[in-house]
């Protein structure tokens, strides 16, 4: 990330705190780790607010081991802290609309074109041809 000047354009995530530990405090944008998400979940249940999170994004799934995750409550709780909520993996347009309307900032999908269509945006072109041939792809703005 540093070699490509991408430190401020990429959010690094891991379920494990120990994987993110070497990056903390070094200017990298990080997602909440699993223990941080569990602490946030406890704060939702006890109505205590988000506190002062040490991460710059919260990336969660709507279901974890068959249990619903309160993603809309996470989004409402984190928005005043300036922390976006990303949800994965959502492929259903109705669910995506409900999540966006509820304050979720981003959706990771197996079908990004369908998600863009749900937002009323045209599908973007695929990756540049040169990236499929093994030659370096052009840099995007």
Ranges and model annotations:
Residues 1-105, 109-141:
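Short loop-to-alpha-helix "cap/lid" segments that border enzyme active sites
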């Amino acid at each position: 990330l540093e070699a490509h000047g991408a430190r401020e354009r990429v959010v690094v995530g891991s379920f494990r705190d120990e994987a993110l530990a070497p990056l903390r405090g070094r200017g990298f944008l990080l997602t909440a780790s699993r223990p941080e998400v569990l602490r946030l979940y406890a704060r939702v249940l006890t109505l205590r607010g988000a506190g002062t999170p040490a991460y710059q994004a919260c990336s969660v799934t709507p279901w974890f081991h068959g249990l619903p995750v309160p993603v809309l409550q996470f989004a409402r709780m984190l928005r005043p802290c300036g922390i976006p909520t990303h949800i994965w993996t959502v492929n259903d347009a109705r669910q995506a609309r409900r999540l966006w309307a509820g304050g979720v900032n981003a959706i990771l999908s197996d079908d990004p074109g369908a998600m863009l269509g749900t937002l009323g945006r045209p599908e973007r072109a695929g990756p540049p041809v040169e990236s499929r041939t093994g030659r370096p792809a052009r840099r995007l703005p």
